[in-house]
């Protein structure tokens, strides 16, 4: 049996793939021959994928968007996410629900819409982008950490349910990643993240993309239900 990291001819969806980590993932997949459809709400696409304006928090919008694609995807990357940080006692219901709706319910909507096509094909690969904060919690992120922890549970449950159908489901848990948004943070925040890091450096978006490409490729065909941390040793 030959093993390859190339993804020629395969169809993928990357949510939140128009910029940042999502753009790096999209570009890495396109570079390896995949046809990538980006589901995002932005009008600005910084990736090499085909942009579709889709609100993943809305189940009907997701179902319609997936059904309208030229071919069913056999790869899905649930990357889209938002933050509405506030301490637990001050967090509003809207701040809680908006993050859960996009980060967790959105991933569920995507998985439910894409999995039937993968099951019919007898193969498929799904990667959920979670976070080390879903494993350890973080002050001011009760909503975000809960959603990311929920994605880990979703990953493991989907891996059990879809494994017999030939579909792998895994997660990648980044720590601090040096996106444009991260570079705009106060220096003391970045310094604290560096001090947490065993490698004394922080990941780039391309580091997350590399892990995703591996999990989507045939090289990871016997890996499912796993959470791979790409955090330069922030959480050990």
Question: For each predicted feature, which ranges?
Answer:
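The beta1-alpha1 cofactor-binding region of Rossmann-like NAD(H)/NADP(H)-dependent oxidoreductases
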Residues: 54-64, 93, 206-207
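Substrate-binding pocket helix/loop in short-chain dehydrogenase/reductase
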Residues: 87-88, 95-100, 182, 193
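Active-site loop immediately N-terminal to the catalytic Tyr-X3-Lys motif
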Residues: 89, 136-142, 164-165, 200, ...
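C-terminal substrate-recognition "lid" of short-chain dehydrogenase/reductases
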Residues: 108-111, 201-230, 235
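Active-site helix of classical SDR
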Residues: 111, 147, 155
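Alpha-helical segment proximal to the catalytic Tyr-Lys
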Residues: 116, 160-164, 221
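Residue(s) in the substrate-gating loop at a strand-loop-helix junction
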Residues: 131
């Amino acid at each position: 049996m030959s093993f390859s990291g190339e993804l020629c001819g395969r169809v993928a969806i990357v949510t939140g793939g128009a910029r940042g980590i999502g753009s790096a993932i999209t570009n890495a997949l396109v570079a390896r021959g995949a046809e990538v459809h980006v589901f995002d709400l932005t009008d600005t696409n910084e990736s090499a994928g085909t942009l579709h304006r889709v609100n993943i928090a809305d189940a009907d919008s997701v179902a319609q968007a997936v059904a309208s694609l030229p071919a069913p995807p056999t790869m899905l990357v649930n990357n889209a996410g938002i933050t509405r940080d506030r301490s637990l006692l001050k967090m509003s219901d809207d701040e809680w629900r908006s993050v859960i709706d996009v980060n967790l319910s959105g991933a569920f909507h995507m998985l439910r819409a894409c999995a039937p096509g993968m099951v019919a094909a007898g193969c498929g690969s799904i990667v959920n982008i979670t976070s080390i904060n879903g494993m350890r919690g973080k002050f001011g992120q009760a909503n975000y950490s809960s959603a990311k922890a929920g994605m880990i549970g979703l990953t493991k449950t989907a891996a059990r349910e879809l494994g017999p159908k030939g579909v792998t489901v895994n997660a990648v848990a980044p720590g601090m990643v040096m996106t444009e948004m991260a570079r705009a943070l106060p220096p003391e925040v970045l310094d604290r993240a560096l001090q947490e890091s065993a490698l004394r450096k922080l990941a780039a978006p391309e580091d997350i993309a590399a892990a995703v490409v591996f999990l989507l490729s045939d090289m990871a065909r016997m890996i499912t239900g796993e959470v791979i941390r790409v955090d330069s040793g922030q959480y050990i």
